[in-house]
Amino acid sequence: MSSPLKNALVTAMLAGGALSSPTKQHVGIPVNASPEVGPGKYSFKQVRNPNYKFNGPLSVKKTYLKYGVPIPAWLEDAVQNSTSGLAERSTGSATTTPIDSLDDAYITPVQIGTPAQTLNLDFDTGSSDLWVFSSETTASEVDGQTIYTPSKSTTAKLLSGATWSISYGDGSSSSGDVYTDTVSVGGLTVTGQAVESAKKVSSSFTEDSTIDGLLGLAFSTLNTVSPTQQKTFFDNAKASLDSPVFTADLGYHAPGTYNFGFIDTTAYTGSITYTAVSTKQGFWEWTSTGYAVGSGTFKSTSIDGIADTGTTLLYLPATVVSAYWAQVSGAKSSSSVGGYVFPCSATLPSFTFGVGSARIVIPGDYIDFGPISTGSSSCFGGIQSSAGIGINIFGDVALKAAFVVFNGATTPTLGFASK
């Protein structure tokens, strides 16, 4: 599921004059990746998206869209009233800060085709399509994204009769046709990968010039290509990996690292605790064993949810969320800004979630997403209610607090370790 969420970049001419405003284009960032670290083992880092600015209400709206939930009027109003330039909090006074002060500004360079065309994609464990803006995308729906041009790739082949379509909660959709082509990430190469070329793109993606497309890492049963579903990049890569795993080590105020085919034992502390995964819906769905707020007592309760790198925030049951914000003086749920806000002068408590008998602690700083607008004394919270979405989502707020193993063996599991 995931998110939709945020990112951005700068300029480059599109071949063939697909756009009338080439100054809005950007060049894909060169790969910032380590070479192959051993047979069947690959490691690469995300890179900072220098132009993205976090917008709380828009982040919540994108999550609704991603999961196909209609947008409530109050949330749409909050998005319309919001501004995109948020500043980092500074002991009560809002100050302008570099964009990397908010952990929603990282993207992953991916090479597609021969010769390689570099696009910056959102690695999304909440979806299963690899789709991109392309030379086939309606010109008016491209606004700053780098595009994939199949005709410039000698290895691109149209998958005859294949189409894809993803519908969103506001009734919009993204859709197009399908090519197979060579796709490489950090030295890990898959030939004949299904690359879904967008002919039509939802406005929520057009408005987000930071993302050139998505690389889905959920289960292939969630793929939307018809008449025959296509495998994800991970599923296609498994045969060449030393082990059928990938790991996410997302950073706080820093780029994260994805590893494929191995587990870096230096990236975490203690041991990894594994938990069962339900693949019924095609997601990395698991059940947390409970939670604690700050130094409070751990409350044992089952919280079923999805591990979703493509969603920025942590969405939990309303009772859990209200229990957290009740510990922050002045915090309140505000429909006018799309969720819980709190005084920027407040020090947020940590939030702990259970993985089996293990405990993963999210520091309070991770939950602070800065002033709701430049100069505001109210800040946007990183823990929000899942009530309107219908599913709990362990997004990046939770995942960056842990080293996470996505084990794609015959019986999939998720592993969490402190770091």
Swiss-Prot record:
It comes from the Eukaryota. Disulfide bonds join C344-C379. InterPro entries: Aspartic_peptidase_A1, Aspartic_peptidase_AS, Aspergillopepsin-like_cat_dom, PEPTIDASE_A1, Peptidase_aspartic_dom_sf. Its EC number is 3.4.23.22. The keyword Protease applies. Keywords: Aspartyl protease, Disulfide bond, Hydrolase, Protease, Signal, Zymogen. Gene3D superfamilies: Acid Proteases. GO terms for biological process: proteolysis. Residues 21-89 form a propeptide. The active site is at D124, S288. GO terms for molecular function: aspartic-type endopeptidase activity. PANTHER family: ASPERGILLOPEPSIN-1-RELATED, BETA-SITE APP-CLEAVING ENZYME, ISOFORM A-RELATED. This is Endothiapepsin. The gene is EAPA.
